[in-house]
Amino acid sequence: DYYASRGLGDVYKRQEEELPRLRTSKYTQSRTGTCFQDILRLLKQGEKVLFAGTPCQTAGLHLFLRKEYDNLLTVDIVCHGVPSPVIFTDYISYLEHRYKSPVKNYNFRDKKWSWYHFNTKAEFKNRKAVYLGTWEEDTFMRGFLRDYFLRESCYTCKYSKHERYADITLSDFWGYDATDGGFPNDDKGISMCMCNTVSG
């Protein structure tokens, strides 16, 4: 969802048809707002809750809850770091000025041509979508992946280690090599899933 990708708030959904809003990579900081309080309320009501976030957000949730809940399942990611939402907002403003149209959606990793050499894509209200280039060519993605504007705490992250707070850890399987008899890399994307707990 474009608004989630702009850091305007975390989204929780209860219907299966609403889940597509949560798909795709979003490389900007999200605001948790009342997310933790909402989760605690749902857990106490006996609802099953799946929380997905960065490792530090997952750790923060567990610290907030102060106890384990059997009806909570947590998922984190192998995190590169979280870029400044101000930088992203400024970048969107630049695109809107350059293309003379408001941005209605932004895809950080469009895989139309390639998973590995993915493109960024901006969709505008008054014109066709614009492919902004591969991550090496797009200004925002290049700065993000070269660590130019991550949050200060990300440079000394204490959660980027093998021990995890989450039940499940997900990531892209970069560096996968099929030469040892594995399935072929078709450049459509390979995911890694680590189960860290019995629940996971």
Enumerate the language-model features and the residues they cover.
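Long, compositionally biased charged/polar accessory segments in the mid-to-C-terminal portions
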Residues: 96, 101-200
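Short, charged, surface-exposed secondary-structure boundary motifs
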Residues: 82-91, 180
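Single conserved hydrophobic/aromatic residue that forms the stacking wall/gate
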Residues: 1-12
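Short, surface-exposed basic-aromatic patches at helix termini and helix-loop junctions that form
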Residues: 62-73, 92-97
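Generic beta-sheet signal
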Residues: 47-53, 72
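Gly/Ser/Thr-rich loops at beta-strand to alpha-helix junctions
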Residues: 51-61, 81-83, 113
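Glycine-rich phosphate-binding "P-loop"
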Residues: 10-37
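A short alpha->loop->secondary-structure connector
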Residues: 15, 66-81
